[in-house]
Each structure stands twice: as C-alpha cells, then as structure tokens.
Amino acid sequence: MQSKASQIDALRSGALSGLISRQAVLYERRLKAVEQLWGTVVTLAPAKHISAMMAVVKLDVASEKAQKDLQVREVFKIMGSGFDISKLQIADISKARPFVSPLAWAYYSAYAAIVLHASFFLDVLQRGLSSDLVDTEKVTQLLKVALPHQEAYIEKYGPSAFHYLLEELESKILIKIDSILEGKQSDTESIEKAALILRESDRLMESNAASKHGLEIDQ
C-alpha cells in the first residue's frame, strides 16, 4: 500500500511539474506575442505620420485638384517622400495571433487598417486619381464598431476624425496586452465584439486591396 501511495504521489508530482512547465512555456510565448504586437504598432509609426497629414486634407477637393494639376500631385509626393509601405516589417505579426486575446488582435487590426488606408489615400492623390477609389465609409463603419461611444464624434467630423481616434485604439491595445499578461480570459462579449471589429477591418483591407489591384492593371 505504501509503495502504491508513493507511486501515485510520484505520478501526481510529475503531472504537476509537467503542467507548470507547459504553462511557463505558454506564458513565454504569450510574452513574445504581445511584444510582437506592440512592436508592430511602433513599426507602423511612419504610416501613422501619413495619417496625421491626411487628417487635414479634404479628400474630394484634393482629389479634384490633383487630377487637374501636376504641381498638386508633386506636393503630395513631397509629403510622402521617404515613406515606402513595402518596407514596413509587419508580415510576421500574424504568427502572434494565436497567443493574444481576440480583442487585442481586433484592436490591432483596426489600427493597422486605418493607418494603411491613409497611406492608400495619399497614393491616390499622388497619382491624380479619383476620390471614388478611397472608401471612407468602410473606415467609418470600422471605427463605429471598434469605438461605439465615439459615433457622434465620427458623424460630426467624418474622415477628419479618423486619425484622432488612433490614440484611443493604441490605449485599447495596451489595456488588452495588460489583461493577457495578467492571465485574464476573454468573455463571450469580448469575443463577439472582436469578431465584429475583425469583420469590418477585413472589409476595409479587402476594399483597399481591390482598388490597388485595379490601379496596377490600369498602369
């Protein structure tokens, strides 16, 4: 009996040790994932800078002028000088997704979609193309879903409001990173909200990708 009890204790001890070891490995992977997530937000700083410049540009007016005037297009090229979206190292961030909470990933996706949309806006003006290519409605819908309490502000200021809500999205990402590090689990409401945000950010990214593809075909 004593021998059996010793064997059971040894098994329990081994199982507990294995569990602790697995949890430690998982925590380390989550730590790496949140570092990747926030690191990518930092990497997107040049695109955020473009967003800041685009916040003061009236899309329809600027597009109309850029289509007619080469000098206007040159001004926008100067505004974007030094910015190359292809050099932003953000592709690997998808590897972090399984290790961060759904809402942390959703807020990041919304943030990335909005700043990259601003860079597409600039590209359209640099080429002297129609403002119809820039789908501001999808950005509006994305922000209303991600930050529903800001709906009145978004309705009042329209596209000019987009950039000024990025700081709040950054804060939301940081809050969710803290929750991940504290080991908090996502509740049903958070998971459902994350799904809605991701749906809208995916729609925006798909819209931008389709427009860019159309531009490449026309060239």
Predicted regions and their residues:
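Conserved non-transmembrane functional hotspots
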Residues: 1-219
